[in-house]
Amino acid sequence: MTTTAAPRRPFFRRRKTCPFSGPNAPKIDYKDTRLLSRYISERGKIVPSRITAVSAKKQRELAQAIKRARFLGLLPYVIR
């Protein structure tokens, strides 16, 4: 006689909210290098939104601000 365990519900991970939406959320600005550097990996690449939980619209704004800051020399393209 074999016993089967009751089917378990899959682990549910709560979706994180976007850090740029809300009443007192920071504004995305290309001059704010401290804020932008939190969304760049240790290799200098832009971290995807599925990791940072940034909404699609704000991720596009963030990527544009990072690219502007790189072009102006405020952020490096590659970190060695």
UniProtKB/Swiss-Prot annotation:
Gene3D superfamilies: Ribosomal protein S18 (4.10.640.10). GO terms for molecular function: small ribosomal subunit rRNA binding; structural constituent of ribosome. GO terms for cellular component: cytosolic small ribosomal subunit. Keywords: Ribonucleoprotein, Ribosomal protein, RNA-binding, rRNA-binding. InterPro entries: Ribosomal_bS18, Ribosomal_bS18_CS, Ribosomal_bS18_sf. Transmembrane segments: none annotated. SUPFAM superfamilies: Ribosomal protein S18 (SSF46911). One of its GO terms (biological process) is translation. It holds the Pfam family Ribosomal_S18. HAMAP family: Ribosomal_bS18 (MF_00270). Belongs to the bacterial ribosomal protein bS18 family. Part of the 30S ribosomal subunit. Forms a tight heterodimer with protein bS6. Binds as a heterodimer with protein bS6 to the central domain of the 16S rRNA, where it helps stabilize the platform of the 30S subunit. This is Small ribosomal subunit protein bS18. It comes from Methylocella silvestris (strain DSM 15510 / CIP 108128 / LMG 27833 / NCIMB 13906 / BL2). The gene is rpsR.
